[in-house]
């Protein structure tokens, strides 16, 4: 299967964490996977495993259009409306590939064959973890994938300072730690990098 993962304009930690976490899992299933994003993402997320292979639509639109057109499956992560992927909306809508929405925002639009929407869950990265486990594939989550999923969960809750009171989140963190992630190092890479992007995220 040829699988394309797309996420929203100006991708944040959860957009990239969920996309890369899903990519690392799908690669263990021997799938051909590409991530396409509409535009640039912050420098403080470039360390994430697999980030260097992400395709920017604003730079490589012709190549991206080919991948989207030829995809068997298009996974739409961390957005609830086609307008959120900017210029990519038209080729994604036109593709014959089966579209799957996986998101945690309210009121998803009806543009995918399958919609997995859980606004009660704090991040799309957490949702990806839950889906992989629901399929019985926890063993196939790699350390690299776990690092990406943890980053998404951490950034979408402000370092677990809001929207993070469910016990399940901390159970999931313990499961990700069992994969060998260093959560303190991940925190330093994301929150102690004082770039312009970082300062903007801090408010």
Locations of regions flagged by a protein language model:
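Acidic active-site catalytic centers that drive phospho-/nucleotidyl reactions
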Residues: 12-14, 78, 103, 156
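Short acidic, glycine/serine/threonine-rich loops at helix termini
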Residues: 17, 46-49, 88, 111-114, ...
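Glycine-rich, phosphate-binding/catalytic loops in enzymes
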Residues: 22-23, 91-94, 117-118, 171
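Active-site cofactor/cluster-binding pocket
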Residues: 55-114
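Short alpha-helices
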Residues: 102-172
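Short, glycine- and charge-enriched coil/turn segments that flank and shape catalytic ligand pockets
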Residues: 30-32, 65-67, 95, 135-140
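Short glycine/serine/threonine-rich phosphate/pyrophosphate-binding segments
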Residues: 13-19, 82-86
């Amino acid at each position: 299967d040829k699988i394309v993962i797309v996420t929203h304009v100006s991708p944040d930690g959860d957009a990239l964490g969920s996309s890369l976490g899903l990519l690392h899992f799908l690669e263990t299933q021997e799938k051909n996977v590409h991530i396409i994003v509409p535009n640039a993402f912050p420098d403080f997320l470039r360390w994430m495993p697999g980030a260097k292979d992400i395709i920017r639509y604003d730079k490589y639109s012709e190549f991206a259009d080919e991948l989207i057109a030829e995809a068997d499956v298009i996974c739409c992560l961390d957005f609830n409306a086609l307008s959120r992927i900017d210029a990519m909306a038209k080729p994604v809508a036109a593709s014959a590939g089966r579209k799957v929405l996986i998101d945690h925002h309210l009121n998803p639009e009806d543009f995918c064959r399958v919609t997995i929407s859980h606004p009660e869950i704090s991040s799309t990265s957490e949702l990806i973890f839950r889906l992989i486990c629901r399929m019985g594939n926890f063993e196939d989550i790699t350390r690299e994938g776990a690092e990406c999923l943890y980053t998404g969960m951490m950034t979408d809750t402000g370092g677990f300072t809001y929207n993070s009171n469910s016990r399940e989140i901390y159970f999931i963190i313990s499961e990700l730690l069992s994969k060998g992630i260093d959560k303190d190092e991940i925190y330093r890479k994301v929150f102690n990098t004082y770039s312009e992007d970082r300062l903007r995220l801090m408010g």
